[in-house]
A protein has these predicted regions:
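Extracellular glycoside hydrolase catalytic/binding regions
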Residues: 1
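Low-complexity, serine/threonine/proline-enriched polar segments
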Residues: 16-20
Length: 190
C-alpha cells in the first residue's frame, strides 16, 4: 500500500494490525538480550569490555558462552563475525549456531548436562574469547576443559595477556554431543 502497489487496508484491518504490533512489542512478549542492548548502546562509543554476568569466580565454573561483553577484537575474535549481505548479496551467518548471543561467536544449543545449555562451536585458528575472572586465592589450580568434537585441536590460556599454558590438546571425541573432560594440572594463578 505505501509503495502504491495495492489498495489501502480497511480501517478494521489497519487497527487489528496495529494492535497485533503493540501486543508483539509488549515487554512480556520479548526477551531481554543483555549483549544486544550493550552492543547497540554502549559499544558504539566504547571498546571497553565488561563481564557478561559479573566476574567469573575462581575456583569455579566458567562457561565458554559467557565471555565478556565488548566488540570484536576486544571481547572475542571470530573468523566470521559479521554478515555483509546487503552490500554483497552473499549471506554469511555471523553466529553459525544461531543461539544465545548476537555477537560473531558461534554458539549453539548444547545437550551437555554439565553445561549451561550452550556450547561454543565452529572454532578455527586464531579465534579467542575474553573472560573477566576474580581469583579468590593465589595458588596452583587444576583446570578441567569440558568439550566435544569430531576432530582434534589445541588451545592456550592467558592471564592479563601473559601465557599461562600453551597448546592444551583436545582430542576427537567422536561426536559433537559426546562430551569429555580434559584435565590440565598445576596452573599457577596469582
Amino acid at each position: 500500500y505505501f509503495r502504491g502497489e495495492s489498495s489501502a487496508p480497511s480501517v478494521e484491518n489497519a487497527v487489528n494490525g496495529l494492535m497485533q504490533l503493540a501486543e508483539d512489542s509488549h515487554i512480556s512478549n520479548n526477551r531481554f538480550q543483555r549483549d544486544v542492548v550493550d552492543a547497540m548502546i554502549r559499544q558504539v562509543s566504547s571498546n571497553e569490555t565488561l563481564p557478561f554476568d559479573g566476574p567469573n569466580i575462581i575456583p569455579g565454573v566458567l562457561f565458554a558462552s559467557d565471555y565478556d561483553l565488548g566488540p570484536m577484537g576486544y571481547a572475542y575474535s571470530d573468523a566470521d563475525y559479521a554478515t555483509y549481505h546487503i552490500n554483497t548479496d552473499n549471506f554469511q551467518a555471523w553466529n553459525q549456531g544461531w543461539q544465545y548471543r548476537n555477537d560473531g561467536v558461534d554458539i549453539e544449543n548444547s545437550s551437555d548436562t554439565d553445561g549451561n545449555g550452550y556450547q561454543v562451536g565452529f572454532t578455527s585458528e586464531d579465534e579467542w574469547l575474553l573472560f573477566t575472572v576474580d581469583i579468590q586465592e593465589s595458588g596452583f589450580y587444576n583446570i578441567v576443559t569440558r568439550y566435544a568434537s569430531t576432530s582434534s585441536g589445541i588451545f592456550s590460556l592467558e592471564l592479563d595477556g601473559i601465557p599461562i599454558v600453551d597448546n592444551i590438546i583436545l582430542y576427537n571425541t567422536g561426536s559433537y554431543s559426546n562430551f569429555v573432560n580434559k584435565l590440565t594440572q598445576g596452573l599457577y594463578l596469582p
